[in-house]
A protein has these predicted regions:
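FIC/Doc superfamily catalytic core
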Residues: 1-216
C-alpha cells in the first residue's frame, strides 16, 4: 500500500480554491462576530473568556489522546502565567504546567520562527518523565524507530497508516519548518490546516504528535 508520503512531491498540497475560499469566508465572518462580542465585554469578562477558551481547548485536545486534565489546574496555571486574578486558584501538576507552557508559546508567540529546537521543547514539557503510559519513549528529539497508526486487539491489529521511515524524518521536518517560516502568501487558517495535515503525516515523535499538531 502506498501512503501519502510515498508519492513524489507529496507535500505540495492542492485544493479546490473556490470551495476553500467559500468556507474561509464563513470562518472569517464568525471570527468577526466573536471579536465584536469580545470588544463589547469589560476587561474582567474578556480575561475570563480567554481563560475559558484556552482551558477548554487544552482539556479537549488531551481528551482526544485519552488523557483527562483537571480543568481547575489548567485554569489556575493559565491565570498565573497571564497575570489574571482568579478566585480559588489551585496548584497544578508538572504535566499541566508543561501543557499550558506549550500552548501559550504556540498562541502568544505565533509570529516567532518555528524551529526543531522549539518543537523539541514542546515535546519535553509534554513528557517530563520520559514515559508515555507504561513505556519509556524518546523525548525532545525525533523518533529513531518506525511509526504506525494501528487499531485492534493484540494479534489482530489493523494498520491504518505508516509514517515515513526514521531516516527520512529530519529532512522531511526541515522542509516542513522552512515552509511554515517562509510562506506568507497563504491565508493563515488554510496554512494552519495544511500544517496540521503535513505534520501528522510525518509523525516525527514517538508520542504527542496530535497535541503538537493542534498547537501548531
Amino acid at each position: 500500500m502506498l501512503y501519502i508520503h510515498d508519492y513524489d512531491n507529496w507535500w505540495k498540497f492542492r485544493y479546490d480554491s473556490l470551495r476553500v475560499m467559500n468556507e474561509l469566508g464563513r470562518v472569517r465572518s464568525k471570527q468577526g462576530m466573536i471579536i465584536g462580542r469580545m470588544l463589547s465585554l469589560g476587561f474582567d469578562s474578556q480575561d475570563n473568556a480567554v481563560l475559558s477558551n484556552i482551558s477548554m481547548e487544552l482539556v479537549r485536545s488531551s481528551e482526544i489522546e485519552g488523557e483527562k486534565l483537571n480543568l481547575g489546574e489548567v485554569r489556575s496555571s493559565l491565570a498565573r502565567r497571564l497575570g489574571i486574578a482568579m478566585a480559588g486558584m489551585v496548584s497544578a501538576s508538572r504535566y499541566v504546567e508543561g501543557v499550558v507552557e506549550m500552548q501559550l508559546d504556540a498562541t502568544q508567540n505565533y509570529n516567532h520562527p518555528l524551529s526543531a529546537d522549539r518543537l523539541f521543547g514542546w515535546h519535553n514539557v509534554l513528557f517530563p518523565t520520559g514515559i508515555s503510559g507504561l513505556y519509556r519513549i524518546e523525548v525532545g528529539k525525533y523518533r529513531s524507530g518506525e511509526m504506525q497508526v494501528i487499531s485492534g486487539a493484540m494479534g489482530k491489529e489493523k494498520i491504518h497508516y505508516q509514517a515515513p521511515s526514521a531516516e527520512r524524518v529530519p529532512a522531511e521536518m526541515d522542509r516542513f519548518i522552512s515552509w511554515v517560516n517562509s510562506d506568507e502568501t497563504i491565508d493563515t487558517v488554510l496554512k494552519a490546516a495544511i500544517a496540521h495535515l503535513w505534520f501528522v503525516s510525518i509523525h516525527p515523535f514517538d508520542d504527542g504528535n496530535g497535541r503538537i499538531a493542534r498547537a501548531l
